[in-house]
């Protein structure tokens, strides 16, 4: 029997009936549906609709549904999806209750609508997944920090316009990505803060027709408070869109990391050696080791952002309140959540196993005039305005290019032909160590500043991990040193 069949004389067209069902994807909301149903039962008991015994019987029956769904053999999802009668997860759970406790199972729907049920289920789903992804972000950030600590004072070129710019510590580069991940975690926290209100009691559109204490269900589900407007509560999917936009930000940051690793793994750079456990070969070229993981990460941003774009278009122009269009927001949500979860899990393990060729990185810092900024700063300390110092060092670079040498390879006479302010102390000012340390400002790549940043980031990632938990990646320790690092 349909949940709404009383008004209709004709049965649904079989093709349409199959097409409009959502159980094939909203089965993923079963834990949330059970939790929301338990909370609603508490409100019904307080309102005198259910006796304490009836409420307990419903709770026990709902527990049986949960136990079957989480069967050790993993058959739970197929058990739900194979049901031929239920049109959605709400109907499925009701059918299971009726099979267990008879007509009492039908009584649970008193004072509630599927419109508020799905709004509640989705808020619970997004909240739990946002917090789970925060744990993955914290775990990956923690590994980035551990790898940064291993790098010590090893340096690498930093790039602007994909051209060598200035040397930075490898740790400074790794910590840049940790900063991005903490911002991503913060966006998820903001998303949770705005969605954390309970729609139960909103009814189909105008509010429940029973005098329910909405605070009971809200408190039982750990929401901050009940929602304030029934029309908004049943039709709001802002939180889905905001969550997907936050996932897009995560994917964008992951894709930047993936792109750099893909480049740095080429023979032309030679800065990293890809872990074999996360690489594949070629069916035609025996010598190949391909960066499939990082290439797929780059591609995933398209799918995740595509989910956000799809939901944007689905919600555009919808009149108040609930419309069936909103059912279509679920698949993009589920798919993007799974893709982000899998991506972060693999990137954390990949980063742990990544082998840095610090000898190649360091060698790359010694050519390409990466100390030109330090040379200009040297002249500034001699009293020359920066614009003039910039011009003078530019001429020195041109002279070095013509001679085939770096700035330190120019003689003092050659340098003084460009400016009399050059002295013998110039050569100490443009060593790699001096070039790094001239950036001695908060957030700069000077060795002392990076050490301070590293210690601060250890505390910040620790706070996130303590709040959301550390994901067990099956690694011996996040600080394990790769013996291939050199």
From Swiss-Prot:
Entry annotated with the keyword Methyltransferase: no
Keywords, comma-separated and alphabetical: Amino-acid biosynthesis, Arginine biosynthesis, Cytoplasm, Lyase
Pfam families in the cross-refs: ASL_C2, Lyase_1
EC supergroup of this enzyme: lyase
Predominant localisation class: cytoplasm
Source domain of life: Bacteria
GO biological process: arginine biosynthetic process via ornithine; L-arginine biosynthetic process
Subcellular location, record wording: Cytoplasm
SUPFAM superfamilies linked: L-aspartase-like
Example of a GO cellular component annotation carried by this entry: cytosol
Similarity-based family: Belongs to the lyase 1 family. Argininosuccinate lyase subfamily.
Xref: NCBIfam families: argH
HAMAP family for the chain: Arg_succ_lyase
Official protein name in the record: Argininosuccinate lyase
Lineage of source species: Bacteria, Pseudomonadati, Acidobacteriota, Terriglobia, Terriglobales
Name of the gene: argH
């Amino acid at each position: 029997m349909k949940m709404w069949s009383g008004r209709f004389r004709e049965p649904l067209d079989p093709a349409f009936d199959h097409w409009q069902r959502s159980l094939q994807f909203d089965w993923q909301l079963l834990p949330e549906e059970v939790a929301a149903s338990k909370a609603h039962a508490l409100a019904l008991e307080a309102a005198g609709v259910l006796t304490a015994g009836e409420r307990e019987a419903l709770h026990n029956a709902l527990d049986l549904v949960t136990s079957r769904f989480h069967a050790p053999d993993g058959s739970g999802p197929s058990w739900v999806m194979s049901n031929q009668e239920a049109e959605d997860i709400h109907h499925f759970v009701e059918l299971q209750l009726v099979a267990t406790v008879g007509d009492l199972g039908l009584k649970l729907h008193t004072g509630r609508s599927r419109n508020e049920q799905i709004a509640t289920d989705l808020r619970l789903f997004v909240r739990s997944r946002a917090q789970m992804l925060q744990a993955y972000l914290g775990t990956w950030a923690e590994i980035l920090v551990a790898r940064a600590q291993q790098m010590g004072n090893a340096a690498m070129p930093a790039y602007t316009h994909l051209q060598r710019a200035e040397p930075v510590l490898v740790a400074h580069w790794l910590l840049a990505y940790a900063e991005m991940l903490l911002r991503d975690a913060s966006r998820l926290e903001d998303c949770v803060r705005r969605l954390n209100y309970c729609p139960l009691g909103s009814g189909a559109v105008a509010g429940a027709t029973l005098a329910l204490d909405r605070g009971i269900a809200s408190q039982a589900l750990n929401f901050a408070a009940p929602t304030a407007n029934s029309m908004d509560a049943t039709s709001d999917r802002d939180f889905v869109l905001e969550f997907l936009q936050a996932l897009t930000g995560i994917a964008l940051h992951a894709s930047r990391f993936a792109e750099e690793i893909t480049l740095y793994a080429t023979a032309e750079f030679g800065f990293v050696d890809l872990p074999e456990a996360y690489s594949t070969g070629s069916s035609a070229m025996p010598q190949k080791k391909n960066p499939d993981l990082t290439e797929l990460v780059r591609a995933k941003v398209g799918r995740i952002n595509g989910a956000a774009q799809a939901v944007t278009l689905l919600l555009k122009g919808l009149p108040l309140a609930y419309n069936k269009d909103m059912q279509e927001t679920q698949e993009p949500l589920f798919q993007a959540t799974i893709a982000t979860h899998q991506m972060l899990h693999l990137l954390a393990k990949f980063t742990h196993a990544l082998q840095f060729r610090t000898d190649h990185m360091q060698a790359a810092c010694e050519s390409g005039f990466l100390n030109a900024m330090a040379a200009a700063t040297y002249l500034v300390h001699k009293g020359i305005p920066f614009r003039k110092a910039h011009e003078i060092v530019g001429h020195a670079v041109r002279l070095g290019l013509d001679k085939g040498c770096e700035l330190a390879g120019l003689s003092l006479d050659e340098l003084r032909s460009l400016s009399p302010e050059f002295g013998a102390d110039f050569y100490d000012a443009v060593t790699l160590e001096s070039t790094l340390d001239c950036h001695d400002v908060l957030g700069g790549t000077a060795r002392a500043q990076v050490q301070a940043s590293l210690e601060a980031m250890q505390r910040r990632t620790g706070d996130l991990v303590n709040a959301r938990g550390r994901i067990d990646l099956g690694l011996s320790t996040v600080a394990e040193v790769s013996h291939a690092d050199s």
